[in-house]
Amino acid sequence: MIKYKIGFLLLAAGSSSRMRGKDKLLQEIDGVPQIERILRQVLKLRFPVFVTVPATDTKRKSIISKTKATIIEVHNSKLGMGHSIAEGIGEITKNYDFLSLAICPSDLPDLKMGSINHLINYFFKSPEMICRPVARGSANVGHPVIFPKKYFEELKSIRGDSGARNIVQKNKTAVNQYNTYDASYFLDLDTPEEFTNWMKRTNG
């Protein structure tokens, strides 16, 4: 089994329940669906990328399958983000040996390759610690969050919709905060109104 320093798990198995019938990951920005938009940025980093999707989904899978990312089908994805993370990590560790994994939702429209790279470089200054971005001057935390290998077993056991938050809280002294003014780590779009307002701001 080949060892890798880091891999990337992109979470795209959510139901977009707050979008009132629309799939936020298929919403187009400059003619590109959001899921493809963030994938393009992550894939520029040239390390293995995995994407969780609902097992019954076809549209998201169709977009992802045209890239070099590996699709992980999540059964019972309605059980929440924690379940998707656990399924994703479980599948990844069957076939790959990563020293760390970055985990990130797919609904961050402003996240770019450069920002991800800055976070990864910061993580490798203390690669035994969990690393997450924190908005400078506030308590706002963002994504991706990078976990060393020693947390993979815990990640495989989480459930519910709180994601990996409980693991981070339980290991507060082992968390390396990346303090930043870069808003792209923190902005996600969950409702039609948020999406519309973001488009207005972006387009001036």
Which residues does each PLM region occupy?
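Short glycine-rich anion-binding loops that position phosphate/pyrophosphate groups of nucleotides
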Residues: 14-16, 56, 77, 106-109
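N-terminal glycine-rich phosphate-binding loop and ensuing alpha1 helix
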Residues: 3-55
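Conserved beta-loop-beta/alpha segment of the NTase-like Rossmann-fold superfamily
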Residues: 78-149, 153
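Residue-level signal for inorganic ion chemistry
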Residues: 10, 23, 35, 88, ...
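Conserved N-terminal catalytic core of the sugar/cofactor nucleotidyltransferase
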Residues: 36-100, 114
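Short beta->alpha connector loops at strand-helix junctions that form conserved
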Residues: 30, 72-77, 178-179
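Conserved beta-strand segments of alpha/beta enzyme cores
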Residues: 25, 48, 70, 174-176, ...
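Conserved alpha/beta core of the MobA/IspD/sugar-nucleotide pyrophosphorylase nucleotidyltransferase superfamily
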Residues: 1-8, 157-204
